[in-house]
Swiss-Prot record:
SUPFAM superfamilies: AbrB/MazE/MraZ-like (SSF89447). Residues 5-47, 76-119 form the SpoVT-AbrB domain. This is Transcriptional regulator MraZ. GO terms for cellular component: cytoplasm; nucleoid. It comes from Desulforamulus reducens (strain ATCC BAA-1160 / DSM 100696 / MI-1) (Desulfotomaculum reducens). Forms oligomers. The gene is mraZ. Pfam families: MraZ. One of its GO terms (biological process) is negative regulation of DNA-templated transcription initiation. It comes from the Bacteria. GO terms for molecular function: DNA-binding transcription factor activity; transcription cis-regulatory region binding.
Length: 142
């Protein structure tokens, strides 16, 4: 399980250090794709396979299902950790998530998310303001 929040910088070549705490769970190769809320989702291979199966079961006749599957898979790439614990994030993914230099790497149970620090701070400010309401809204889902 992934949890915690870590701040790291992207270097001039687009490389980001993967927190040591997450490396073991992710393995040497894992999938990075466009996520929701302007961040990147990072999945270990086995978790990606489960997500892929679920998405493949969506009815291709529905326009919204096709659009989501295209969005999700077109942005996906396999990344490999180098000897210094870094990954090279492709330019298209850095642009999508507005990643420039300062980033926040967050553990979210079965996946890791990569955020620009500015977007993460903005998201957290909104979420904190409505945290109690969010909790009330989802309590029935638990």
């Amino acid at each position: 399980m992934f949890m915690g929040e870590f701040q790291h910088n992207i270097d001039s070549k687009g490389r980001l250090i993967v927190p040591a705490r997450f490396r073991e769970g992710l393995g040497d190769r894992f999938i990075v794709t466009k996520g929701l809320d302007n961040c990147l989702f990072v999945y270990p291979q086995h978790e990606w396979a489960e997500v892929e199966q679920k998405l493949k079961s969506l009815p291709f006749t529905r326009a919204d299902a096709r659009a989501f599957v295209r969005f999700f898979f077109s942005g996906a790439t396999e990344c490999e950790v180098d000897k210094q614990g870094r990954i090279l994030l492709p330019n298209n993914l850095r642009e999508y998530a507005k990643l420039d230099k300062e980033t926040v790497v967050v553990g979210v149970s079965t996946r890791v998310e990569i955020w620009s620090k500015e977007e993460w701070d903005r998201y957290n400010a909104q979420a904190e303001a409505s945290f109690e309401q969010l909790a009330e809204n989802i309590v029935d889902l638990l």
